[in-house]
Amino acid sequence: MNKLIFIIICLGIVDKTISSDFKSYNDGIYSFTYDNICSFKNSIRDQDVYELYYVQAPLLYATYGNLLEKINAYHSGIVLYNKNNGPNITIDYYAIPSFEATLFPKSIIKDSQGNYNITWDTHGLIEVTNYINETYWNKRQLIMYDLSGIQIKQYLSWAPIYNKTHTFYNLFNIESDLSISNSSKIYKNSSTCDDFVWASFDVLYKLGGTIASVQSDPQRDDIKLFISSGEPKIVDYNDSIKRNQIASFFNELKDFANLGKNKTALEIFNELITFFNGYFYCYIDGEYYEMKLSKQNPISFTYLPSPIPIGKRNFNEIKKLGFCK
């Protein structure tokens, strides 16, 4: 079964809100987000030396434990290990209020005129903690070493800028159908925990981090929608006909999530393939996009090695906060 379909079914089976991360911390452990990160940044000592680890945890761990690890579905982040017995750092980008909220609207309500109103509650948030949850982050790989406290401060000054330009958590890369042309054209990029991690690798490399010797590039999840209709079209939400079409689409998608309770995996898969061959809608950065998915290969979910930075470093490309009050 396609991994995304399996995840959607899992979301439908569970009736409670699902957090994308495990947020239970002991006393003395503090969390900082992009709007108050300076409080944490100013506690880091310039002379400290850090190692950077790429860490992963099974997706929806708080609800399913290690189950989704079996299909290589992970939440990812970065751990900065302090070699001078100073504070360790964990930083990740996650979906709030839940992973489910990235796929389904908060509410779809029909008014007295028979028209729908759709409400979303989904965002992407960077969180920094002075703690490493060894139980939760059960996979790790050394990526860089010899990062100074000064470089870590500079990195933490970059993170709020990233979050302000990536306020929505978006699961999908949207690309042209490979069967139509020899090369794929990317129309929309995803904005996920993995995307944040790889952006962090790039920034920390430019700041002077030394790449560790690894046998292969680290692996990451990647979900792609392949479309045959050309560039996705922004839908006019104020057009009641279009809005009702969007509402019907997401109601159907939610119904598919609930099918896992009384249908076989093969039945669900076949129905979803038929569904995906029609028009598809995505909610990205506060806009609705309409597209026609490829009949041959509408969607892919991969877990493959992805390159880490090499070559020339350009420190001046990094946008960051100039100072912290």
Curated annotation (Swiss-Prot):
Belongs to the CLN5 family. InterPro entries: CLN5. It comes from the Eukaryota. Glycans are attached at N88, N117, N133, N163, N182, N189, N238, N262. This is Cln5-like protein 2. GO terms for cellular component: lysosomal membrane. GO terms for molecular function: hydrolase activity, acting on glycosyl bonds. Keywords: Glycoprotein, Signal. Residues 1-19 form the signal peptide. One of its GO terms (biological process) is lysosome organization. The keyword Disulfide bond does not apply. The keyword Glycoprotein applies.
